[in-house]
Amino acid sequence: MNKKVFVSGCYDMLHSGHIAFFEEAAQQGDLYVGIGSDKTINELKARKTINSDAERLYMVNALKVVKEAWINSGGGLLDFLEELNTLKPDIFFVNTDGHTPQKEALCKEMNIEYIVSKRVPHGNLPARSTTALRQECRIPYRIDIA
């Protein structure tokens, strides 16, 4: 039986960095993905999502490396607690941006292996982050003056 690997995040503006992260996590076993709800993201990041939680769920579930994805039911930084207790994963996989002492302590308490990955782009692709993409999107391609 394969190990259960859990990851959690926003996954708004899905990009090659997310895919590389999912592929790396899936090398450890069957990949389960918890997705932050629109409400949680708005509360944590004080902004609306580009893609609704329904769209993000559809896109993440469509990826062949993902065994199952869902919208996390809780709120705050540990919005996945209920799902984590239900899934009982063997591994909680995060990248350096997603690592927090609270997640690490929770995994120790629940006897879940906690793996912190470095952000490594796939092949010769550039490093990507949603924050950087959002900043690039703010630059207008043209300016209309009325």
Mark where each language-model region is:
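Nucleotidyltransferase catalytic core that binds NTPs
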Residues: M1-A146
